[in-house]
Amino acid sequence: MLTRRHIMGALAASAAAPAAANAGLPADALARHALRPMEALVGRTLILGFLGDAPDAPGADAIEADLAAGRIGGVLFLRHNARTREGVEGLARRFREAAPDAWLAIDQEGGVVQRLTGDMGYTRIPRAQALAEGGLDAARPLFETAARELLEAGFNMNLAPIADLHDAGNDAIGQYGRAFSADSRDVAQWCATFIDAFEAQGIACAIKHFPGHGRSRGDSHDGYVDITATWTFEEAAPFGRLMRLGRAHLMMGAHLVNLRLDPDGLPVTLSRRVLHGLLREVMGYDGAMITDDLDMGAIRNHYSREQALTGALAAGNDLILISNSANPDPDLARRAVDWVGAALVAGTLSVQRLAEANARLDALAAHLRPA
């Protein structure tokens, strides 16, 4: 059994002497990606948001052009993009035509975080806490219906489920009933059932928010959140159980600081100690990593977009989410290539790291394809 001493020792070792992060990735895939143009490697890691809620929205023009040129690998839909069924499905069709294999990502947890709502004609998904009270047998067909509807609407990535532990005093999750339980075994069982329903439709599920956001005090949408005093290793347990159950193929890290896990004070999103040292080396995760939105206050208030994007890639993230709505930049995808190029020259990022990210995205897509 892994002890706290073992884990902390591994984190220190990871920071002092970074090891290869490509365990389990095919050597031929890594070699192939390492020879691809940098623009293609970077573009595939980017999932950008936009302004607009209809297919003819000006913000959709730049997204369509970026998709068609391979400058981005996917599109993030937020609440302001999903106001009507006709609008959101029309946008999804437009983007899918531009890039058939692109990730179209949206939050469809249920409860207060359900972008395709009942008012728009989709099935209402109760909040996780309410679902848990009704039991798995009642929830399973609801998850299956929600997954079919999401696919029919044009999406292939759900930024859910929540694998955090319930704590009523939590500002971002607990007070809204977004977590299934305070028990790690129950949380893992519920998340596995949720994932099964969506993956059966070929939809990727981003399990969030590693290493656990449930007992935090503060909301990283608004600003800096330090979990050093509140976090325990129990909060990482649901993520570990999902790995052992074979359900963890895409995971989202949190914009949280834990000085016990990273004494440098880097948020998890930018911390190699946590994403590589804890998650991959200690816990054995071999799936893909996706950031939470880098435009959230916890990141935006402390780092430039260049620092956040290149730092997130260097830390071990394979997909980068940027809503691009707080300060919209139609040239963000092009700038990202320049930023990564500068990081490569500076030695803070490597082509090998980009190749690893692309190889993991290959594996994620292959997992979701019908047998």
Which role fits each region the language model picked out?
Residues 1, 6-23:
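N-terminal export signals
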Residues 22-118, 321-322:
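N-terminal hydrophobic targeting/anchoring segments and the immediately downstream early-domain regions
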Residues 55-66, 139-146, 236-238, 305-309:
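Short, acidic/polar
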Residues 75, 107, 150, 292, ...:
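Conserved, mostly hydrophobic/aromatic
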Residues 83-95, 189-342, 348-349:
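Second-shell residues forming the walls of enzyme active-site clefts
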Residues 84-88, 133-145, 188:
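Glycine-rich anion/phosphate-binding loops
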Residues 96-123, 143-166, 187, 195-211:
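Glycine-rich, aromatic-flanked loop segments that form ligand/cofactor-binding clefts
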Residues 338, 344-371:
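Mid-to-C-terminal alpha-helical segments outside catalytic/metal-binding sites
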